């Protein structure tokens, strides 16, 4: 059975079961198996009994591919309190057997302190070693570091595109089966520079070669073109939206929620100035139906580990928007779920709720959220982490804070008087009333 085709067709459980018995001898099965675990959307869809139980059984026998796969599932799914510890143990076991992707995965545990320890030098060492050994996961991390910036350094999308081009040229020269992620990240790196509509072919190629996340990007490209504000429901937009939902793409569910939110906004004005019980009832029923669709789509996306969906659910409860009942506790829970999955935006909003005593938690937890946010790249929460440390808290993270965060905080370009860094940002994260602030284009990028 062609393992690559199972990957491209989205038959992930079948791929696991086809590849596991032949991983030691079949290089194509190895590569297809490892590529499945490059996609969060694919990994969270794996059936526990059909795929995860066999992986656990093989991991316990010392199979390094199974150890790595089980570690990735635990890391991406995060279904329990011990998920990251289980992930680390299995990733370490696979890395000790020199599986390149496991070395890359281990690098990320040191990069972000998943096991409580941040060590950027160790992360760099492991990532470079994995990359030189041919790890595709390491290559993706290197591209993302250029694409989104790293350790509070600016993004370099042109270098991300350059590396993606090199990887595409290499696979063509070596006549390897295409990796859809190289096309995906080349498109991501180029879309702001040359326009979203000019990278559609790369996103289409990514989808063809096993990147389900590309559904969301194609929905945006065909629906919004090079504009993030005006939706035109073209036949291509509708096609990829429906196909994405059919294939359980988290981003497709989120995009359908975004479309329905626009419809809800329009419905709120419908019949507003007209009298009559019938008109009022019709408007109410239409708004209720729209709210139910928004709730359903956001919930589905969140269950598929879409952090933007957790943030949007939190916003809906926080503001009482789109027919949601205003509920601070539910907002807090939604943001907390986003934090479990490393959402910077959710960490900032959660921290502000506690800072403003909308939800009371002990100061240790408030500080813990701050240092998580600092690790993930929040300039606001880096500042709060350093301030907490200066006030005698977070002493268990002395080395991490003094080595990494103090120098950034003390740099001349990082000023508390600079709106882009800190001043004013706190109020923009969650305003006290009205609609969510579009502080940095996150919402427009999706909606």
Question: Can you say where each PLM-predicted feature lies in the sequence?
Answer:
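N-terminal leader/linker segments that initiate helical-solenoid repeat arrays
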Residues: 1-29, 46
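Structural signature of tandem alpha-helical TPR/SEL1-like repeats
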Residues: 10-13, 44-53, 81-90, 117-126, ...
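Canonical positions in the second alpha-helix
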Residues: 22, 58, 93-94, 130, ...
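Short helix-capping/linker turns of helical repeat alpha-solenoids
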Residues: 25-30, 40, 60-63, 76-78, ...
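Intrinsically disordered, low-complexity Ser/Thr- and acidic-rich flexible linkers and loops
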Residues: 176, 228-229, 266-288
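DE-rich, low-complexity intrinsically disordered acidic tracts
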Residues: 402-447
